[in-house]
């Protein structure tokens, strides 16, 4: 079994987003939210309208959650793109509704297993491999690192214990190893 990888190619990321849109706005927004927040899928699926909107219906500029894995409080701003998309997505939703509702039952979130199936199926349709629920978070990390080149900042965002764990997690160490092998010759 191969290790889940970030999606490094921006064109493939766009292609995957388009594929998810074909399935429905919920599936697209699930991926888009994970991709642009760096949250673990277990936290993404449990978001509800109250997490992103104030009681008067205006959008919050920050999300505050208690991470399911670490039990730590995490507060972070919504990037502009996510803010715009989330405002459109939640326009007709009520406070207390889960953002990514299961189609089974009343106001239940989709499971992490269902999130995996959604992402995996769309990824396979466009020819991506080594995809899993961590793909969103790893892709966030990879592209954040490519934009800002600040491993300490990314380590803090992802709540990792060391820079090397962060670099391994986002696949940058493996990229560097691969490049060194390709360019090595005695």
Task: Annotate each predicted stretch with a short phrase.
Residues 1-186:
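Conserved catalytic core of the tyrosine transesterase superfamily
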